[in-house]
Swiss-Prot record:
One cellular component (GO) term of this entry: cytoplasm
Subcellular localization: Cytoplasm
The encoding gene: rlmE
Coiled coil ranges: none
Residues at the catalytic site: 149
Keywords attached to this entry: Cytoplasm, Methyltransferase, rRNA processing, S-adenosyl-L-methionine, Transferase
EC number: 2.1.1.166
Family, as annotated: Belongs to the class I-like SAM-binding methyltransferase superfamily. RNA methyltransferase RlmE family.
Catalytic activity: uridine(2552) in 23S rRNA + S-adenosyl-L-methionine = 2'-O-methyluridine(2552) in 23S rRNA + S-adenosyl-L-homocysteine + H(+)
PANTHER family linked: PRE-RRNA 2'-O-RIBOSE RNA METHYLTRANSFERASE FTSJ3, RIBOSOMAL RNA METHYLTRANSFERASE
Record's protein name: Ribosomal RNA large subunit methyltransferase E
Gene Ontology terms, MF aspect: rRNA (uridine-2'-O-)-methyltransferase activity
InterPro entries from the UniProt entry: RNA_methyltr_RlmE, RNA_MeTrfase_FtsJ_dom, rRNA-MeTfrase_E, SAM-dependent_MTases_sf
Species, as recorded: Methanoculleus marisnigri (strain ATCC 35101 / DSM 1498 / JR1)
């Protein structure tokens, strides 16, 4: 772990609280400010490793909590984890089965591996957001909610516009726990319209 991480006050706070990553505080703030997760919601976390958002979700809902990632996630009580690509129809079918056929909320803190080239990284993050939106439109029940991470840039407005086709309330939100200088911004989408037409492919 690099020194810039260990000197990070949010990181130290997360480790002291028993969270697997500092990102836990981002979801806690999003929930406090936006009320995305309700007490009995079934929630799917995309790109869930190492599992800090799953830890938060487990405490926010008595519903089913399912984490999906290409990499294994260390087990935790009250959480189902799936190793696989969430864009794979077979993985999506298993997610539906684990959720009992009803998914109330989709969240994603997933980020592409960054190259340091701002425009390239932003385009890849937008692509990942498109995939998460298409997934949410496939599995969410009407009235469901979604939170996905993206990066500010020239394509961000297009992803917001696409999301508004499928949710009644959509806004961008930057958390206080985000690192200074980071372009990351979360899309908070509430009240899914129940339609998934045109939610696939490039913007």
């Amino acid at each position: 772990m690099g020194s810039q991480w260990t000197k990070d006050s949010v990181y130290r706070k997360a480790m002291k609280a028993g969270y697997r990553a500092r990102a836990a505080y981002k979801l806690l703030e999003i929930q406090q400010r936006n009320g995305i997760i309700r007490p009995d919601d079934n929630v799917v976390d995309l790109g869930a490793a190492p599992g800090s958002w799953l830890q938060v979700l487990r405490d926010l809902t008595d519903g089913r909590v399912i984490g999906v990632d290409l990499n294994p996630i260390a087990p935790m009580e009250g959480v189902t984890t799936i190793v696989g690509d969430f864009t794979d129809p077979l993985v999506q079918e298993r997610i539906r089965e684990e959720a009992g056929g009803v998914v109330s909320v989709v969240v994603s803190d997933a980020s592409p591996k960054l190259s340091g080239q701002k425009s390239y990284d932003q385009a890849r993050a937008i692509g990942l957001g498109e995939d998460a939106l298409a997934f949410a439109c496939t599995v969410l029940k009407p009235g469901g909610n979604m939170v996905i991470k993206s990066f500010q840039g020239e394509l961000f407005g297009e992803l917001i516009a696409e999301t508004r086709k499928h949710f009644y309330s959509v806004r961008g939100y930057r958390t206080k726990a985000s690192r200074k200088g980071s372009a990351e911004t979360y899309i908070i989408a509430k009240n899914f319209k129940g339609t998934c037409d045109d939610a696939e492919g490039p913007l």
